């Protein structure tokens, strides 16, 4: 059974019809324009009024996702005061199967947020305190020589604290780069290899790392390969006057509220699959591609500010993060397709850790967010506006 749902496709009112025969999707407009995919061919002709048809179960699942997301936010809000954007970013990472890097000075509630999240989602939780003397085996585990009842000796793998579902890597940049890199395989593959034997981690597996600002003493910058594996980098700021007063009321009155379980692992995996079913139309996909390419200095889509202040641009993981996070945002806005605004909203947390500033930017005190905001402002939504945008950028 099909039902009809009015939505917006990349900022345009639209409706999508999924035809079971031939795996065909079609976007149709009143003027006969639109985009269709079938038989390995794609055709996009913008213009006209679009109408979309969604299968009823898909629409119901999207509405249920919004309701369940709100339930998780409510429980976290019982413990965590403020930091609305940070909580939203953390949950976005969770529902796409990504990992999250939180940056902020000590004492802002980063660890409490992770612990509350694990309690709300009924997931196994381990905390690893990163220190300069921490070794990779302390994280991953190691083979131990064990003696059997018969008196024989054999190697037995003793799992490390990373064998959990929510792993808090606390103050990750206080450990040496060798130890930091121990998480590379676990974050990308969801496995741990010790002495040639691969061990699977239970799903969902979510790494949330916290780090202090890199200018503080006793910190080591994360390797670029590891930073790129974090889906989002979120900046945790200070609480304002009202939030700080609420924190005092909650933590000094003797009764600290607790979050209760409202979701579990299998349900999270279900929502992760739903997110990937959200439609990314070709013109929105092209916008994601052009935004990512605009961060590449000396590239064909590079802007003047890119060439001036960036040494390296975003990897393809940045484009993947924009698309997937945009899909979560679309579901939360009641749509089953990604719009330009969805992409813009997640642009900074998805790319701020994936661009590397050059010496000139560092000398002038330019931050990555400043460069990215300028790119976001100058890259047009529609590809046919590129010549005008290029002329404006040069001027």
Segments the model singles out, each with a brief description of its role:
Residues 63-100, 105:
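Pre-Walker A (pre-P-loop) alpha-helix and adjacent loop at the N terminus of AAA/AAA+ ATPase modules
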């Amino acid at each position: 059974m099909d039902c009809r749902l009015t939505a917006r496709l990349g900022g345009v009112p639209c409706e999508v019809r999924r035809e079971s025969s031939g795996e065909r999707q079609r976007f149709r407009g009143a003027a006969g324009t639109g985009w269709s995919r079938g038989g390995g061919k794609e055709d996009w002709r913008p213009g006209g009024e679009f109408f979309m048809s969604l299968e009823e179960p898909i629409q119901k699942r999207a509405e249920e996702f919004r309701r369940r997301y709100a339930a998780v936010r409510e429980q976290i809000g019982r413990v965590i005061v403020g930091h609305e954007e940070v909580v939203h970013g953390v949950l976005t990472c969770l529902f796409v199967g990504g990992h999250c890097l939180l940056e902020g000075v000590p004492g802002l509630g980063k660890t409490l947020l992770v612990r509350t999240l694990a309690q709300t989602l009924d997931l196994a939780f381990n905390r690893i305190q990163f220190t300069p003397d921490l070794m990779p085996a302390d994280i991953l585990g190691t083979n131990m020589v064990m003696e059997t009842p018969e008196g024989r000796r054999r190697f037995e793998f003793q799992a490390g604290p990373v064998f959990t579902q929510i792993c808090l890597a606390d103050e990750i940049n206080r450990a040496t780069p060798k130890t930091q890199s121990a998480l590379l395989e676990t974050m990308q593959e969801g496995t741990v290899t010790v002495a040639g034997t691969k061990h699977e981690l239970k799903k969902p597996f979510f790494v949330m790392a916290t780090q202090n600002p890199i200018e503080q003493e006793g910190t080591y910058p994360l390797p670029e390969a590891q930073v790129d594996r974090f889906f989002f980098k979120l900046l945790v700021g200070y609480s304002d006057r009202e939030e700080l007063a609420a924190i005092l009321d909650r933590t000094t009155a003797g009764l600290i509220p607790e979050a209760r379980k409202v979701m579990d692992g299998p349900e999270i995996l279900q929502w992760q699959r739903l997110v990937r079913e959200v439609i990314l139309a070709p013109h929105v996909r092209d916008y994601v591609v052009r935004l990512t390419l605009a961060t590449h200095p000396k590239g064909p889509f590079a802007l003047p500010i890119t060439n001036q202040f960036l040494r390296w641009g975003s990897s393809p993981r940045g484009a993947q993060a924009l698309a997937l996070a945009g899909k979560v945002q679309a579901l939360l806005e009641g749509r089953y397709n990604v719009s330009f605004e969805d992409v813009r909203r997640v642009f900074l947390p998805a790319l701020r850790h994936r661009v590397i500033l050059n010496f000139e930017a560092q000398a002038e005190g330019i931050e990555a967010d400043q460069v990215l905001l300028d790119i976001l402002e100058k890259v047009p939504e529609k590809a046919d506006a590129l010549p005008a945008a290029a002329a404006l950028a040069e001027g």
